[in-house]
């Protein structure tokens, strides 16, 4: 039996905790997450359910809730539920008198996940060995508006630089993490955004980190999905051995047909007519570029190959 290495982690832009899950799946580490940071309500609830044991029964039977006014204030201070489309914060106060259990559920999920909320409102992070940083991709993804991630641009992807601010704070306090793992879409290293990525690497170097990056495709990592992502591992220079390497690509033969059921309940299907209508509505509303339109429609049986995700 392998003695697991203790690894403390801060998960920034934590989502549902897949960074943590990936580390745990290696079987090499005893992971302790000190804090998370996310503002998406569904992601926060999912994180707590997947990693912290949150259940409906727990929400109903938990006996140490503060007052509803205090819960609403706590979530508001953390900016939980902020809507980027309308640029408005969620009004938690409207749930105080209604008795709506969503207030209890989200507050408890935040507590269980040690969620600090909006990264732009965090003053400092607890010391950990590793920070994981899956910053928002909406402003650099080919499925988005390509607004960029330049520092000070106030795009969603530029929230990356708030993490750099927090890193400076930690360094000044003598609490620099040993490692930082960045992950984002392949377009991060495209001609359009490579200068910003290079600026990130230069900044990390100035702050005392050596950075190693690679574009990895899930289909060469044992997953039947054609999904390319940039991974960047930054290691503190005083502990870097120079031996960092990325895994060699491999194909274990697993295909999409091996993962899908042949008989699926009709309620899970959207027929082509409905899919076409949905795509038209999304394009008209400006939430789906025309270039993405062909992805949502079932045009052929591709189960023997790989699922494609941009």
What do the PLM-derived regions correspond to, one by one?
Residues 1-33, 44, 79, 87, ...:
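S-adenosyl-L-methionine-dependent DNA methyltransferase catalytic core
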Residues 42, 65-69, 161-166, 173, ...:
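Short C-terminal domain-edge/linker segments immediately following a structured domain
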Residues 60-66, 180-189, 281-297:
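A broadly tuned preference for mixed-charge, low-complexity surface segments
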Residues 157-236:
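Conserved Class I SAM-dependent methyltransferase catalytic core
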Residues 2-177, 186-191, 195-197:
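Core alpha/beta nucleotide-donor-binding catalytic domains of modification enzymes
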Residues 140, 223, 246:
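Short clusters of hydrophobic/aromatic residues that line enzyme substrate/ligand-binding pockets
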């Amino acid at each position: 039996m392998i003695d697991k290495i203790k690894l403390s982690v801060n998960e920034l832009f934590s989502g549902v905790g897949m960074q943590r899950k990936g580390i745990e799946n290696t079987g090499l580490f005893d992971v302790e997450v000190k804090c998370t940071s996310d503002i998406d309500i569904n992601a926060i609830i999912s994180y707590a359910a997947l990693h912290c044991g949150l259940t409906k029964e727990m929400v109903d039977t938990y006996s140490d809730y503060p007052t509803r006014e205090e819960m609403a204030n706590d979530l508001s201070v953390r900016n939980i539920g902020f809507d980027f489309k309308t640029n408005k914060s969620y009004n938690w106060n409207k749930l105080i008198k209604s008795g709506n259990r969503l207030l209890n559920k989200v507050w408890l999920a935040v507590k269980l996940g040690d969620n600090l909320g909006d990264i732009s409102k965090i003053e400092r992070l607890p010391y950990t060995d590793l920070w994981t940083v899956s910053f928002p991709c909406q402003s650099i993804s080919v499925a988005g508006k390509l607004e960029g991630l330049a520092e000070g641009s106030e795009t969603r992807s530029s929230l990356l630089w708030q993490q750099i601010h927090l890193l400076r704070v930690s360094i000044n306090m003598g609490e620099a993490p040993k490692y930082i793992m960045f992950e984002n879409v392949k377009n991060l290293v495209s001609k359009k955004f490579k200068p910003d990525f290079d600026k990130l690497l230069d900044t990390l170097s100035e702050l005392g980190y050596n950075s190693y990056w690679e574009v990895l495709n899930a289909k060469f990592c044992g997953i039947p999905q054609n999904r390319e992502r940039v991974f960047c591992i930054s290691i503190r220079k005083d502990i870097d051995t120079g031996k960092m390497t990325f895994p060699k690509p491999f194909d274990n033969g697993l295909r999409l047909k091996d993962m899908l059921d042949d008989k699926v309940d009709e309620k899970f299907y959207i027929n082509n007519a409905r899919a076409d209508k949905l795509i038209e509505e999304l394009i008209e509303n400006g939430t789906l570029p025309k270039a993405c339109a062909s992805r949502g429609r079932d045009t052929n049986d591709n189960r023997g190959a790989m699922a494609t995700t941009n």
